[in-house]
A protein has these predicted regions:
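Charged, low-complexity, helix/coiled-coil-prone segments
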Residues: 30-53, 123-125, 146-154, 170, ...
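Juxtacatalytic substrate-recognition/specificity segment
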Residues: 69-199, 307-313
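Residue-level marker of intrinsically disordered, low-complexity segments enriched
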Residues: 12-18, 40, 44, 54-56, ...
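Generic preference for hydrophobic/aromatic residues in regular secondary structure cores
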Residues: 24, 49, 56-62, 82, ...
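N-terminal low-structure segments adjacent to metalloprotease catalytic domains
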Residues: 1-75, 94, 318-343
C-alpha cells in the first residue's frame, strides 16, 4: 500500500486519531487561560449572535506572496504563512490557502471572543508543508493523520499527501476530488487557541462543525451545512470526505459522560467526534431560542477563567443531563437521525 492509499484509508478513522498532541494537557491550557480579554472585547462578544449568513465568500483570486531561500519556499496569504520544503506552483497554493482563509473568515464570525483575534498577534499564522510523510512524522505528526495542530510552538504541520498534492512531472498538482476537511479541522484548532481548548467535546465538536461546511469556489455554503453534517455522520460525507457511516439510528454513551470527561477521556470515547459534532450543532442552532446564546455564554465563561464545571452550568441552564438528552434526541429526530443514549 503506497502513501496515498495509506492516507486515504486512514481518513475514515480520523475520529479515532488523536489529532492534538499532549500539548493540550492541563498545564499548557492553564497557562493560556491566564491571558484575559479586555472588558471592551468581552462586552462586544457578549452582544454577538451566531452567524446568520447563508454563504461566506473570499475573492476569487487570492493574492499570494512568495519568498525563496535554499531548501525552503514560503508563500503568504492574508493571514497564513506556508513554508514548504519543495516548490509549489502559485495556483496550487491559492487553491489550498483558500481553505485556511475560509476557516479564518468563519471562525472570526463566531461569538466566542477568540483570544487569537485580540491579543496583538498580528503575525502570520504558521503552516509547515512537508513533502515526505516520514519527515512529517519525525516533526511531530500523528501516524495516519493528514495534518496536526501543535499548540506549542503554535503551528500546523501538513504532509503533502494530506493536502492532496500529487507529483506530476517536475511539479505538484492538487487533487481537487479530495475532501480537505482535516485542514479546516486543524485550522479551527489554531484559531481557537487559548482558554477555549479545554473540554474535548467542545474542542473537537467546534473543529468538526467548521470542517463540515461545504465549499464551492472560495465560498462556504452555510445554507447546506446541516445536510452536510448528516451525511458526514450517517454516511461517508460530502465528496466521500471521511464520514463515519454510523447510519440513521445511533446509540451513544450518556451525555454527561461526554460533557464531563477531560480531553484524554474524550479521545477514548467510542465515536466521540461525530457525537461531539451533533451536540455542538444542537447548542449552536436548536437549544433555547436557537441563537447559540448558551454556547456563547459557556465560551465566555471559559475566557473569563472559569473551570469546566462552572462553565457547563451556562449550557445546563438549570436542567439535568437526562432533560438535555431528550431535547437533543427530539431535535435530531426532526432531521432524520434517531439517537439513543445509554445510561
Amino acid at each position: 500500500m503506497d502513501a496515498g492509499e495509506r492516507f486515504q484509508s486512514s481518513l475514515t478513522q480520523v475520529a479515532e486519531t488523536p489529532l492534538i498532541p499532549p500539548s493540550l494537557s492541563p498545564a499548557p491550557r492553564a497557562t493560556s487561560a491566564s491571558h484575559q480579554p479586555t472588558p471592551l472585547l468581552v462586552e462586544r462578544s457578549m452582544r454577538r449572535s451566531w452567524p446568520q449568513q447563508k454563504r461566506l465568500s473570499l475573492p476569487q483570486e487570492l493574492p499570494i506572496r512568495k519568498f525563496t531561500q535554499t531548501g525552503s519556499w514560503t508563500y503568504r496569504s492574508k493571514h497564513f504563512r506556508f513554508t514548504s520544503n519543495a516548490p509549489l506552483r502559485d495556483h496550487v497554493v491559492r487553491e489550498f490557502s483558500s481553505l485556511f482563509e475560509l476557516t479564518h473568515l468563519y471562525c472570526s464570525q463566531l461569538p466566542f471572543d477568540l483570544e487569537r483575534l485580540h491579543t496583538g498577534r498580528k503575525s502570520d499564522l504558521e503552516v509547515r508543508l512537508i513533502e515526505d510523510y516520514s519527515h512529517y512524522l519525525r516533526e511531530g505528526g500523528a501516524s495516519g493523520s493528514g495534518g496536526i495542530y501543535l499548540t506549542e510552538p503554535d503551528l500546523i504541520l501538513i504532509p503533502f499527501e494530506g493536502l492532496g498534492l500529487k507529483k506530476k512531472y517536475d511539479s505538484y498538482a492538487l487533487d481537487l476530488t479530495r475532501s480537505n476537511q482535516t485542514l479546516m479541522h486543524e485550522a479551527t484548532h489554531m484559531m481557537m487557541r487559548g482558554p477555549l481548548l479545554k473540554d474535548g467535546w467542545f474542542v473537537e465538536g467546534a473543529a468538526e462543525y467548521v470542517a463540515t461546511i461545504p465549499i464551492r469556489k472560495n465560498t462556504l455554503l452555510i445554507e447546506n451545512h446541516r445536510e452536510s453534517i448528516k451525511s458526514y455522520v450517517v454516511s461517508y460525507g460530502y465528496r466521500d470526505g471521511g464520514g463515519h457511516n454510523l447510519g440513521r439510528e445511533i446509540e451513544l454513551s450518556s451525555l454527561q459522560s461526554l460533557m464531563e470527561c477531560d480531553y484524554r477521556g474524550f479521545q477514548e470515547l467510542e465515536n466521540g467526534y461525530p457525537y461531539a459534532l451533533l451536540v455542538f450543532h444542537y447548542f449552536a442552532h436548536s437549544d433555547g431560542d436557537g441563537d447559540g446564546a448558551r454556547l456563547r455564554d459557556y465560551a465566555q465563561a471559559l475566557n473569563k477563567g472559569a473551570d469546566s464545571s462552572t462553565a457547563r452550568k451556562k449550557l445546563l441552564a438549570g436542567r439535568d443531563y437526562r432533560t438535555l438528552e431528550k431535547l437533543l434526541t427530539n431535535s435530531w429526530n426532526q432531521h432524520g437521525i434517531a439517537l439513543k443514549f445509554r445510561n
